[in-house]
Amino acid sequence: MARASSGNGSEEAWGALRAPQQQLRELCPGVNNQPYLCESGHCCGETGCCTYYYELWWFWLLWTVLILFSCCCAFRHRRAKLRLQQQQRQREINLLAYHGACHGAGPFPTGSLLDLRFLSTFKPPAYEDVVHRPGTPPPPYTVAPGRPLTASSEQTCCSSSSSCPAHFEGTNVEGVSSHQSAPPHQEGEPGAGVTPASTPPSCRYRRLTGDSGIELCPCPASGEGEPVKEVRVSATLPDLEDYSPCALPPESVPQIFPMGLSSSEGDIP
């Protein structure tokens, strides 16, 4: 009887030890509703059992979420830190500007770059002021008052045979208001003056203007068949500023004196 009781006690103890092992078994759903039993580990998929946690899919999902959350926290912390540094730097700049404006209020402020009154002198005008008040053009070229008017002229006459006669020397004319008429001389005499009345009708005037321009206009009385002769006049006259030299009457044109070499030197090609 004693052995029977001892045998029953050992079986109960062995059954108590095997009970946790039976509880470790896990019934997993299989393919086509055919469950299978995992002796150790966890259900992994439809046919096998997983012993370690890194073999489970939700393990990696959990770690991925944790890493992303940590990155977001670090990014927000860095942005907050940079914003605080920028605010502190701006506060220091404002303090420096305030002290410079208070202590540098003399005629020569120490913080000239921060003084708005000093910088306002370099401020350009407003756009509306520039539009409504455009800049005026420069004044025209005029002769100084009280200065005598002088004119130097040169007459070049070219014939149809491409040969030019002799050039002659002349003197300057003091003014046009006197309208003095010189006696006519022949072309062969040196130093003789030629008046506009003795100028051939078939000619054209070339006048140098104040802006270094050249006005060339044929005379209205010139004919088409006659050889064209050219008279170059450089004069600074107030009457010639607004008119063409060909539109003036013969009285207002200054006296023209030919200049050049004597006839003994021969023709100039």
Swiss-Prot record:
Tissue spec: Expressed in most tissues but at significantly lower levels in placenta, lung, liver, and kidney.
Residue numbers covered by motif PPxY motif 2: 137-141
Assigned keywords, A-Z: Repeat
Stretches the record annotates as Disordered: 169-203, 249-269
Motif extent (PPxY motif 1): 124-127
UniProt GO molecular function: WW domain binding
InterPro entries: WBP1-like (IPR021684), WW_domain-binding (IPR051994)
Residue ranges with Polar residues bias: 174-183
Assembly and binders: Interacts with NEDD4. Binds to the WW domain of YAP1, WWP1 and WWP2. Interacts with WWOX.
Domain text: The PPxY motif 2 mediates interaction with WWOX. Both PPxY motifs mediate interaction with NEDD4.
Name of this chain's protein: WW domain-binding protein 1
